[in-house]
Amino acid sequence: MASSEAEWVTIANNLLFKCHIHLRIHELQDCDANVFIALYQSILGEKVPDLIVLPRNQEDEAHNVQAVIDSLALDYLQVSLSHITGENIVKGDNESIRNLLEIFDGLLDYLTEHISESSPNKSETEQYSKDSHGEEAGEDLERTEEAKWRNASFMRCSFSSDTLGPTWDEDEAESTGEIIRLGDTAHTFSQRSNGAQNSKDLRSRKASASPGVEPPEEMLNPGPLGFLSQNGPPCEAASETPPMSMVPSARKLGEPIRAAIPLHPPYHPSEPRAPCPIGKEYLWSSRYLSTPTSGEHMAPSVEPDDAFLTSTLFKDDDQETYLPKPEATRTRKPSKGERDENRAAIPSEHLPFSQKARKPLTEQELHAMSEKLSQRLSELDWMLKTALGDRGTGETDGNDGDGGGEEVRSGNEEMLSQHSDSVMEYGPKKPRPGFSTCRKAPYRSHSLSPSSVNKHRQLEKEKKRQHKSKGTDSCHFQAKALTEAFERELRKHKVQENVGLRGIREEEEEEEETGKSYREVVPKGTSKRSQVQKTYSRKTAAPSPKGDGRLKSSKASPMKVSEHSLLSLMLEQFPFLYVSDPTLTKMWKQQMAQVEQLKREAQRENRSKKKLQDEIEEALRRHDLLTALVKKEYDHNKRLQDFRDRIQRQRLTQSKIKENRHQSVRARKYYDDYRVQLRAKMMKMRTREEMIFKKLFEEGLQIQKQRLRDLRNYAKEKRNEEKRQHQNELDSMENHYKDQFSLLAEAISQERQELKVRQKFQAQTLHKVKRELRAKMEKEIQQLQHMITQNDDDAFFRELEAERFKARLQLASFQYSKNPFPRGQTS
């Protein structure tokens, strides 16, 4: 490890020396943000986009390094560098620093080699243009230069970490596949399935990398624009582009798929960079960016559809049971586990400057990818169902008491605000008026001691504290979910404790109220009976007009019948009727029995929740039994003493008591005889009215029971309808996601077909150009050979001289014919 670290320190110092940067490092951890920013600016000749000039903390430095990595990945390499993050480099991770140094080293070597290769090519072309004669040689030179710049314009867009196209001797399909390709999307998806081979590939790549190793000579990418502007013809020579029918398809291949690559680790700026332009767009940008004032960074924003595709396809795998935030168009920062996964998921064939050819995405990988996405969608649906199930349990707990129900209601509304569109969809139902929510306990006259309840409350608080302390040690996202669950449990326990105390007190108050209402009903009946006795004793006439007016008013106004007020309401509606005490008592008992039966039916669902209350009642009952035993023994001793005293007093007053007894017996006998006679007399008159009243009371009980059953059935139907509606919403959501995934698969297959068509077309074009060049070269070679063979023949030269002399003679005779008799030649 020490020797390898020393080698990397040497590589870093050599890079700094070659770039004329006055910095020297002694350890690998000394390569901080300033070193990589200086390397970027000196090698590429541009400013780092989104650079924070004066970083104040470690996050700003991580942001600067991340900007360097993203600029390399998007603008130059066009490959995913998610295994290198700015945060790891600022922290001093040796693996990330070595990877980034290797990228800069290979980039610098490639650019220097390209410059050195382009300079002799330029001198050769100049010499060839000087020696060539005629128009054909000039046209050939122009064609070769145009072909070079066409290749250069294509190769700018395909600058990646793989082998960037073979030479002319290799297969033409492979070269066109390297020039025009789908991008890194398919490889980014397939990198996750290659986790088992990642560590071995990284080790082999490190072993093969060394300071003296040069980049492969077959790379045809011309590098950054600053170096290209010095070496070739001017930018006007590059104005010729591929046919216009190919440019829209290339743009379609470049832009949307580039937006789907997750190249946004932490500290990445919110504004994404533009995808790599192809064709005329890149030539236009090279014409203006190659000027000396081209240091600024142009970053048009990505369309909202692309951003939404990014946010929906690349979510965190370690997501908790809560739904994501509503702003789906913003790009999420991956978690630490995802960064580690991406760092380990880059095989050797996708690393920078590797010599392996990239393979297209197969159907099996697409199928596995769609299965992963569907599995993630089912997990999200399951999380939503579990969240809604927790809410349902909170609603059942909220119906235990009045005060506690309000707390649970508020807690359910808070939870529903996170999972549902409105609180009214799944909000707690109001309790029906005919039901009591607490079990009836035996009547006690003394106050309850809350010692056991306080102990239980303390135990619950201690458990909650321990649970909270454990939750704070976990991750931040898990802590948030645990605190919310803890708050729900706290509200549940508070409601149970309040119900435990309040239920017993309410039972006592309820018994007192029922006793009071019974005592109020019975005296009313007796007073009315006495009034009726007076009216019947005076005259047996029809009821007074007041009673008629009362009946009319009661018919006009709507009736409100509670669970205890049916009998009292009927007595108020029929004040002139006489009801005997046994019948009245029997009716009251029937009503109480029906109320108790309804209470028992309502409390069957809550028996499991009142287990703690039963234990408290059992302890209190034992306490009452012990107290009763002590009191009974004390009363027994006191009774014995009183009995002895009473015997002594009875012997003195026996005669007086005997006389008073005889008098009371005689008076009682007289009163009973009178009462029996009067009752027999009145029963004959009131039997019919009593039967009518009894029948009406039974019908009222049946109406009340039927009404409660209808209300219960209505509530059950509403709940079933809400469940059905919720299930329909879940099904529609699932169908929507399935449709989206099917559309995505169709788009990918269509783009692959278009890519194959373009590759085939370019292969045909290359074959045609090669055939034309070969035919032309063969023709020129044949002419040269023919000329060489003729130059060796002396007769050929003599014939040439003869023909030239003949031509001169013809010209001379033609001139002589114009002036046939010159003066100077007559003699």
UniProtKB/Swiss-Prot annotation:
Alphabetized UniProt keyword annotations: Coiled coil, Cytoplasm, Cytoskeleton, Phosphoprotein
Entry annotated with the keyword Phosphoprotein: yes
One annotated Gene Ontology cellular component of this protein: spindle pole
Species of the source: Mus musculus (Mouse)
Bias-annotated ranges (Basic and acidic residues): 123-145, 327-343, 360-372
Chief localisation class: cytoplasm
Biased composition (Polar residues): 187-199
This protein's name: Centrosomal protein of 95 kDa
